[in-house]
Amino acid sequence: MRQFALSLALILTSGWASAFEAEDVARFGPPDSDRELRIISTADIAFFKPMISSFLASESGTAIEYTVVSSSELQKAIVDEDEAFDVVISSAMDLQTKLANDGWAQSFTSEATGGLPDWAVWNDMLFAFTQEPAAIVVSKSGFGDIPLPESRNDLINLLRQHPEVFRGRVGTYDVRQSGLGYLFATQDTRASEIYWRLTEVMGGLDAQLYCCSSDMIDAVKSGDLLIAYNVLGSYAINREDRDEFAIILPSDFTTVMLRTALIPSNAPSSELAALFMDHLMTLSHGTDAQPLTHPALDLSQNEASLNRIRIGPGLLVFLDQLKKRAFLSEWESAILQK
């Protein structure tokens, strides 16, 4: 009996250990509601709260459970653990495309989704509701009289001219851990070879590596970093302390991520999920659109320099295991320089 109990404990412990890890969980709406929408998302609660609040205002009696995870943990929850969520939201467009392509999303059409621009929908399964640029975030006070960079070439020259100032104080994504960071990095290499030169220069100055945009911005605020590269501009511009930062959209090209949503194939409340998707698309693309990003990040003025990442099977190229291993090996050589 004791042996059986020990074996059972090991099995249960093993199951707990393999469960996906949530960074944050919040509940909105009536605490005792039996009409609940479960959302799993890579977006911070503060970033997405306005959309949740506006939906609940139109759907009284509904509750929303909002779970924040990393992009890799999102994949684990949906694919490995078959968790029952109603809506899946992520900034990692390639991983979202893979979910839809591999049969983890259900088809959905409505009046709201029928009028979307071509770049905002793929196969009636994956829907984009924001356009968010990758930005260079700089500490205004930390730069002093040093001129701000306007392009990647400017940034390279700046780092080479002032190594004593920037050593250990430049940050970017750890693309081994961050799905969005990996997406941005691979798209940068498609746009220009300058990415590898910049990565080598940052690596030579002991670049600090981070999981997510919010941590990089916090590090710039605290003074641990002076520069954060490929940060989500939407996260920086929506902060109350945004005046402390210079948010630079590189003039050579600005990579633009589309945050996407899908309804998973096993959604327990698919009808409620459809209502939420309608709301999301209407607010994002309708005649009275209310973008989640700040108007100061209006991209229409920079259309010529935009490198807008397109949803579709082209995003799956760098998810091929051989290509991914080769990319990460080259990235580690450039950024770690061991």
Tell me what each language-model feature is:
Residues 19-98:
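Early extracytoplasmic/lumenal segment of secretory-pathway proteins
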Residues 34-37, 58-68, 84, 166-169, ...:
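A local structural motif
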Residues 42-43, 91-221:
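Extracytoplasmic ligand-binding site segments that recognize negatively charged/polar headgroups
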Residues 85-90, 209, 226-231, 246-247:
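Paired acidic/hydrophobic, glycine-rich loop segments that form the ligand-binding mouth/hinge
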Residues 94-98, 221-244:
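A ligand-binding cleft/hinge motif common to bilobed small-molecule-binding domains
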Residues 105-114, 125-128, 243-255, 265-266:
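Short beta-strand->loop
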Residues 135-142, 185, 257-272, 288-291:
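A bilobed periplasmic-binding-protein/Venus flytrap-type ligand-binding module shared by bacterial periplasmic
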Residues 264-321:
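Mature extracytoplasmic/periplasmic domains
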